[in-house]
């Protein structure tokens, strides 16, 4: 990602054992100018001797994980997975040599490279690559270049859905969209507003050991489908905290069987071990831990629920950050919401905190209490955020448009001079002043938790 700081790029390069870069110079790393390389006398081919040394399971690329909740990790993507992804996704989307795919996600991201670009290579299709996503340019681009497919992450459609609606939004050549993160509340609206015929939603991770779960059926809100009796049914299991398989409809961590018991997910083998679970159901089996919570119904449809690090426990209940965020957005008063758990002195567990970019001013008492009433109608009492802060600009994101929660969790509720904060006190949201904050930090503020 060329927008990263020199220091971060240098750290990532050193940690990953990079010896040569092509393009942007990185301190202490030998760099080649791509324009000079293209002007050289290189034939464009690779010697047969060198090709014979490369196997399907050798790394094709190293993709850094997004780093939304911690440090980015270098994940390996083999030639086998790259070819397999291209075949699978080109078939799922009906891509052909006549197709044009609009790629506005970076090519150092799994969706941009392995899902979309590899499909174009496999199908012989045209990849229309934009430097970065733009709400304003989206429809103009797909019309200008006659793109019939678009790769996405959920945030892309959330930003587009918040843009002013035009009468001709549906007059565009896009027929199929594919990616992950298109939630149930957005699904039908996106198809209707933009005139899209089909969605292929999936669940996957850059470092996962097998093919992604895909939902090609068009059933809204689901990220995967494995019909009962299919050979792959037993290769994906959902388990509880004690690694017992959960019943249909219940939520559990997704485990994927490692094919052939051979797994290389990261450049650092120690990181591989942290993701694996051995001898779980029978001697010699090997499973990859996703760290994500999913549910599966009796028909075999999977729904993404939350990341395990994206939930917190309060009043003996697990609170899903995603569920609370969706409730906040559904009020119609908020443009962007980030939910996370924060510690309160003297209390066990974590209370919910939401950092909110409102559409209009929320600070006035009645408006804020109307907002609280809406949340109380949508959420159980333990799910209503106890602390909210209001911001005037979009939150900091990764290069793949994912909001970085780690920094917000570190800040907690101590930036009251910089952002207006409100705390749920005596049944309503009140301004968190310096005096109230001091009382809260000393455990002297009775918030009615007990």
Segments predicted by a language model, with ranges:
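Short beta-strand->loop structural element characteristic of the AMP-binding/adenylate-forming
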Residues: 1-20, 73-76, 103-104, 125-132, ...
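ATP-dependent adenylate-forming carboxylate-activation enzymes
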Residues: 1-11, 25-27, 125-144, 319-324
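ANL superfamily adenylate-forming
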Residues: 20-56, 83, 210
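Conserved pre-ATP/AMP-binding loop-to-beta segment of ANL
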Residues: 44-64, 71, 94-100
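Conserved AMP-binding/adenylation subdomain of ANL enzymes
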Residues: 83-100, 108-149, 163
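Gly/Ser/Thr-rich phosphate-binding loop
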Residues: 122, 139, 144-152, 161-222, ...
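AMP-binding/adenylate-forming catalytic core of the ANL superfamily
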Residues: 204, 242, 256-286, 291-383, ...
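AMP-binding/adenylate-forming catalytic domain of the ANL superfamily
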Residues: 379-403, 419-447
């Amino acid at each position: 990602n060329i927008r990263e700081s020199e220091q971060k790029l240098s750290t990532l390069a050193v940690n990953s054992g990079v010896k040569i870069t092509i393009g942007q110079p990185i301190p202490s790393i030998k760099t080649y100018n791509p324009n000079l390389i293209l002007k050289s006398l290189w034939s464009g081919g690779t010697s047969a001797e060198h090709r014979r040394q490369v196997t399907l399971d050798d790394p094709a690329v190293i993709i850094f994980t997004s780093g939304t909740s911690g440090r980015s990790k270098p994940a390996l993507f083999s030639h086998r997975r790259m070819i397999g992804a291209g075949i699978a996704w080109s078939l799922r989307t009906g891509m052909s040599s006549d197709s044009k795919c609009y790629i506005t996600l970076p090519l150092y991201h799994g969706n941009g490279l392995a899902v979309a670009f590899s499909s174009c290579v496999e199908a012989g299709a045209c990849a229309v690559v934009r430097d970065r996503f733009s709400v304003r340019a989206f429809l103009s681009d797909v019309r200008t270049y006659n793109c019939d497919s678009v790769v996405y992450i959920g945030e892309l459609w959330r930003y587009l859905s918040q843009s002013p609606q035009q009468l001709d939004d549906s007059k565009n050549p896009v027929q199929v969209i594919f990616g992950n993160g298109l939630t149930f509340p957005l699904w039908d609206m996106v198809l209707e507003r933009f005139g899209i015929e089909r969605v292929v939603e999936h669940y996957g991770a850059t470092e996962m050991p097998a093919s992604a779960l895909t939902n090609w059926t068009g059933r809204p809100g689901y990220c995967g489908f494995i019909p009962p009796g299919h050979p792959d049914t037993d290769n994906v299991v959902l388990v509880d905290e004690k690694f017992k398989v959960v019943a249909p409809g219940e939520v559990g961590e997704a485990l994927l069987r490692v094919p052939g018991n051979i797994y290389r997910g990261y450049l650092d083998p120690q990181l591989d071990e942290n993701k694996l679970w051995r001898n779980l159901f029978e001697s010699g089996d090997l499973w990859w831990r996703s760290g994500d919570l999913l549910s599966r119904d009796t028909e075999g449809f999977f729904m993404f629920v939350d990341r395990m690090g994206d939930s917190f426990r309060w009043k003996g209940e697990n609170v899903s950050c995603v569920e609370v965020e969706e409730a906040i957005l559904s009020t119609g008063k908020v443009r962007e919401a980030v939910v996370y758990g924060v510690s309160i002195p003297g209390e066990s567990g974590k209370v919910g905190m939401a950092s909110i970019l409102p559409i209009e001013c929320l600070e006035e008492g009645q408006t804020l209490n109307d907002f609280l009433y809406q949340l109380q109608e949508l959420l159980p009492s333990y799910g209503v955020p106890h602390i909210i802060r209001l911001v005037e600009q979009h939150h900091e994101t990764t290069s793949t448009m994912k909001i970085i929660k780690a920094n917000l969790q570190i800040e907690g509720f101590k930036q009251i001079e910089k952002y207006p904060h409100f705390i749920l006190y005596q049944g309503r949201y009140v301004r968190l002043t310096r005096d109230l904050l001091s009382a809260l930090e000393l455990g002297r503020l009775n918030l009615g938790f007990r």
